[in-house]
Amino acid sequence: MELDDFDPEDKEILSWDINDVKLPQNVKTTDWFQEWPDSYVKHIYSSDDRNAQRHLSSWAMRNTNNHNSRILKKSCLGVVVCSRDCSTEEGRKIYLRPAICDKARQKQQRKSCPNCNGPLKLIPCRGHGGFPVTNFWRHDGRFIFFQSKGEHDHPRPETKLEAEARRAMKKVHMASASNSLRMKGRPAAKALPAEIPSQGSLPLTWSFQEGVQLPGTYSTPLIANAPQQNSLNDCLSFPKSYDLGGSTELEDPTSTLDSMKFYERCKFSSSRIYGSEEQFQPPVPGTYGDYEDLQTWNKNVALGRNPSDDIYYPAYPLPVASWPYDYFPSQNSLEHLPQQVPSEPPAAQPGCHPLWSNPGGEPYEEKVSVDLSSYVPSLTYHPPQQDPFLLTYGSPTQQQHALPGKSNRWDFDEEMACMGLDHFNNEMLLNFCSLR
């Protein structure tokens, strides 16, 4: 059927050329997009076609210069094949997509075949009179006009999606191969039996609720400014053994000591409770009943004498400073107390270092060698918020304490093992001592 048999409108649609000044606009139907256009063909696509907007083609095409700015010109690059003409396991030939850049395409030809590691070669396109097949794209009005000149004389290369999938699979294979080679190069790791961590390898944490095991030769200065949680816990209860893997159980204070030693140790612990603010201040006359002996002791320290060389050391409880009320034992608590406390309290055995700092010297100056190999702090009690380091034992006017008599130095390791008292018993016993 010749062109003379068509209507003038149909003739215009069929006889247009991409280089015409005016292209037909009375197009009733548009063509479906063609992925592999070949030979001398022409297509009219809708301007809404996304593939036509992208000028997509499965042939390896690159943009070329054109004197007409309204027309996009693309030339075919051909196909890259294996020089050995190898095939994959599925029976397909190796037809790679050529790189668009000239340098990248030259570098691609020096690579080996991904299937047989043979050399690659480029088959150029010469389907348009010895020149590459050319595709033309032109946007005009509501349509996109496409025209191809020439016939491809080479096999179809892989599409862009196939090329991307092949590169991804190649990267995965290379990564797995390198990992396998790395694992083969390493010596086989011997499976070690599970080791139970020893006591020395475990972290040693300082806590108020659990015991801490220190070396027997540990020596540290006694810091007067104790933490607030430890202000009411001067009586410590020590376990016979300490195990990091098990629970620590405290001994019953009344099961190992009689009532006389029990009273004696509680009296010693009461003399070690003092305030953090008053430890740096000199005593005031009238506060203590034995102020003159305290002055004599302070003078000896100022003259350079070591307080540890004296025969005895006074243990003075601090005065009631800023608590708004006093602690007095109840009648019910006093009814059961005479059954445990003897009628004549024995004299406290001196020999420990006083915790009262030297007024003329630096704080925390005196040091005491303490064996803390099995110390376990007792339960903590939170004192009032005003002065957490002051504890009252009754009215200041009623306190009368006698100086301890001369005696041999008591065993520090034994006497430091004070019993852990709860808040009620500690308060009850210390108030009873002040009333007597």
UniProtKB/Swiss-Prot annotation:
Q: In which tissues is it expressed?
A: Placenta specific.
- Please tell me where Zn(2+) 2 binds in this chain: C82, C86, C113, C116
Any one GO cellular component localisation term in the record: nucleus
Is the Zinc keyword given for this protein?
A: yes
Keywords from the named record: Developmental protein, DNA-binding, Metal-binding, Nucleus, Transcription, Transcription regulation, Ubl conjugation, Zinc
Q: Which Pfam families match?
A: GCM
Compartments reported by the entry: Nucleus
Q: How is it modified after translation?
A: Polyubiquitinated in the presence of UBE2D2 and FBXW2 (in vitro).
In the UniProt annotation, what is the result of changing N65D?
A: Loss of DNA binding
Give the source species: Mus musculus (Mouse)
Quick one: effect of changing C82A?
A: Loss of transcription activation
Q: Spell out the molecular function terms from Gene Ontology.
A: DNA binding; DNA-binding transcription activator activity, RNA polymerase II-specific; DNA-binding transcription factor activity; DNA-binding transcription factor activity, RNA polymerase II-specific; histone deacetylase binding; RNA polymerase II cis-regulatory region sequence-specific DNA binding; zinc ion binding
Instruction: Give the stretches traversing the membrane.
Output: none
Q: What is the effect of changing N63A?
A: No effect on DNA binding
* Annotated function: Transcription factor that is necessary for placental development. Involved in the control of expression of placental growth factor (PGF) and other placenta-specific genes. Binds to the trophoblast-specific element 2 (TSE2) of the aromatase gene enhancer. Binds to the SYDE1 promoter. Has a central role in mediating the differentiation of trophoblast cells along both the villous and extravillous pathways in placental development.
| Residues annotated to bind DNA | 14-169
Binding-site residues for Zn(2+) 1, renumbered to this chain: C76, C125, H152, H154
Reply yes or no: does the keyword Protein biosynthesis apply: no
Any GO BP: positive regulation of syncytium formation by plasma membrane fusion
What's this protein's name? Chorion-specific transcription factor GCMa
Substituting C76A results in: Loss of transcription activation
